[in-house]
Amino acid sequence: MNERVLNDPLQALWQSTRELHGRFNVQPTIYVQIPLILEETAEAIKAGLFESRQAVVGEIADVIVVTLGLAMALGIPYEDVIAGIHETIRKNDGKTTDTHYLNPANKIARKT
């Protein structure tokens, strides 16, 4: 495993995705990436229900790749993706049983 993967695997995946697009002379667009996200998500769901843990892990990685491609298609820089991840972590960490509850659909929802 190379040094860039060990230091920041998400950034390495971002760069790998850019390089993949470059090798095939592909410019990601929302019209390409959104169907790919739907396809890869369906494959991840199928793997989660019927396939091995290793297959699920691979499909999850594929969902991340095509989602990063959507960010690229929209011109969103890697740093903004990371900022969004940090914001989600902050929000998740702030959710407690005092502020949220588990609704009947098993979704953590804000108390009103």
Model-found features: residue ranges?
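Flexible "arm" and connector segments at domain edges
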Residues: M1-I60, I64-T112
